[in-house]
């Protein structure tokens, strides 16, 4: 999850919420629903119940958690067969965060090429879009610690 640089309070809150989802088993449930197995297992170890300091909540619009993502990357984020409903691991994670923070969740579907520009302009509170952590992104944005482990493979023609 990526947030604007300097939004450290919100980053701490999101980290605590993710830890809470690990602690209560919900993160594993979401992963198993979308991947068929718990791809979060072993990524984080949370042994004590985290607390959420909602005084650190900082959003673009009161009462809403606005999420930037690109709905074309199943099983992370995509649309259902009708094309009207967003579904996927990241969608369910965002909904859980919204519920924990007492906020309505709004999704902004955008192209990945422009997703960080939208965050910079304040069009959404955070990016939840299977963003890889790179040194360049860590320099420019606040980024959560990893919360999912998926394997990448290269496929070639025989």
Give the location of each predicted region.
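A bilobed periplasmic-binding-protein/Venus flytrap-type ligand-binding module shared by bacterial periplasmic
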Residues: 1-17, 152-158
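Ligand-binding "clamshell"
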Residues: 1-5, 41, 53, 123, ...
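Soluble non-cytosolic domains of exported or imported proteins
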Residues: 4-12, 21-25, 84-92, 109-113, ...
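Solvent-exposed coil/turn segments that connect beta secondary-structure elements
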Residues: 5-6, 35, 70-73, 81, ...
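Extracytoplasmic/secreted cell-surface and envelope-processing proteins
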Residues: 11, 77, 116-117, 136-138
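Ligand-binding clefts/hinges and TM-proximal coupling segments of bilobed small-molecule sensing domains
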Residues: 15-58
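Extracytoplasmic small-molecule ligand-binding "clamshell" domains
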Residues: 29, 53-54, 60-131
């Amino acid at each position: 999850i990526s947030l604007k640089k300097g939004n450290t309070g919100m980053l701490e809150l999101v980290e605590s919420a993710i830890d809470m989802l690990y602690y209560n088993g919900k993160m594993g449930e979401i992963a198993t629903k979308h991947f068929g197995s718990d791809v979060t297992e072993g990524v984080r170890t949370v042994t004590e119940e985290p607390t959420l300091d909602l005084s650190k909540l900082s959003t673009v619009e009161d009462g809403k958690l606005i999420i930037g993502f690109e709905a074309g990357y199943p099983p992370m984020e995509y649309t259902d067969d009708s094309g009207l409903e967003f579904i996927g691991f990241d969608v369910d994670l965002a909904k859980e965060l919204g519920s924990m923070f007492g906020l309505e969740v709004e999704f902004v579907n955008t192209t990945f090429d422009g997703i960080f520009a939208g965050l910079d302009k304040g069009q959404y509170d955070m990016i939840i879009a299977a963003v890889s952590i790179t040194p360049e992104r860590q320099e420019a944005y606040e980024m959560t610690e990893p919360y999912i482990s998926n394997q990448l493979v290269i496929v070639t023609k025989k």
